[in-house]
Amino acid sequence: MRFVSIEDARPGMCLAYDLYDSMGRTMVGSGCELTASYINKLNEYGFSGVYIEDEQSKDIYIEATIPEKLRQEGFKCVQENDIDRCAEIAQQIVENLLSRKNVCLDMTDLRSYDDYTYAHSVNVAVLCCVIGMGMGMSERDLNYLVTAALLHDLGKLAIPKEILNKPGRLTPDEYQLMKTHSTRSYQLLSKRWNISAHIKQTVLLHHENVDGSGYPQGLMGDEQSLSVRIVHVADVYDALTSRRPYKKPYSPYEAVEYLMGACGIMFDKNVVEVFMERVPLFPRGTEVNLSDGRKGLIYENKGPHNLRPVLNMPDGTKLDLMENKNLNVTILPPEYLDTVSPDSEEPGRKKMVQETARKKIMIVDDMKTNLDAMRGILEDEYTVILCKCGKQALHYLEHNEFPDCLLYTSPSPRDRSLSR
């Protein structure tokens, strides 16, 4: 099977995979021949693409990451705000993925606009589990992580759909309302005795950045749990690769470029590195352009060697880019999409990454009000790195490039880290 974007879908193509609505009902079944009417309707519903059968892709089989029934049960429990059931589904997701020798993340997600919030939560849960497995988490910690991922956006159910799906940029008031969703999610869980404090904190803090510029508490990376840092990466990746009313989807390659560019600013470098080992940049069944002018379909990805897959070529042959004779052939990155803001609840993220070439200023101050004030003054022209103490600053400097300028207040007797 081959993935075809909805813009490239044509009447007469034969569907290779079922398409479902937000209630889990089959809209169009596999084996159905696409018509112009079907394509228009799928486009209206917001599907980014479809899987089709053709001669070149007949030996490409793409396995769903988790069973469709389990995915639909996950949609339902999030949609119905069933917190206890979410915890049960999280455990089933962990058990399912741990029981498999190889976890396949090759399938491009197929969903409509209407089920975005529910599908997003399930996708983030699966991504978090795979990253957590790669980082050696115990089964208990994986259950906590995946439960938090399923619950992380419950607060969005209280935000009007016209704001969630607004085609244009959010107003300042709308953006502030959107930013309350993590706190709303936490409040829904706060009095639940059977939900651990670790899960609640992960839900509350999943929009924190490692440089302290996130929300709601402005925590530095070393103040965040590993679960928080994992959910943040998975959340942004899935948001970027999703088609929304206000943007086209990023390709996996473009989304990973975004994550890499924001390491040390938004994301934990170690988490992103494990993510890149586990998630293919070019999923199976997608067409790619080669540096020698040819095109091919991704037939097989080889673990950490995501940039050197095996391709199905139009003449029926296989091209293994790991073989020595093919080392001079590379996959060309897709053209950069001219999109609007990549995610409604964090419209400044794309700008933040694109402007990493700006001069960097590190500010060290134990007063959060001072840090916020300085950031407000400088962030339009500089990349601002905030640290609440010398220890945090030293930790940042050990793992990242030195800033162009360092501003710090006179250290208190308890904090002589930068004065030694």
Where does each model-flagged region fall?
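Divalent-cation-assisted or electrostatically stabilized phosphate/pyrophosphate-binding catalytic cores
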Residues: K166-R184, D211-R294, G303-L307
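Non-catalytic signal-transmission and effector/linker regions of two-component phosphorelay proteins
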Residues: M352-M362, R375, T383
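Non-catalytic interface/linker regions that flank or bridge core catalytic/transmembrane domains
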Residues: M1-Y118, P304, N312-Q354, N370
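Conserved small/polar residues in nucleotide/adenosyl-binding loops
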Residues: Y408-D415
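Acidic, metal-coordinating helix/loop segments flanking the phosphotransfer/catalytic sites
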Residues: L386-D404
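Acidic di-acidic motifs
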Residues: D365-D366, C389
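Two-component/phosphorelay signaling modules centered on CheY-like receiver
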Residues: K368-L386
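Acidic/His-rich, divalent-metal-binding segments that scaffold phosphate/diphosphate chemistry
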Residues: D54-K179, R184-W193, H198
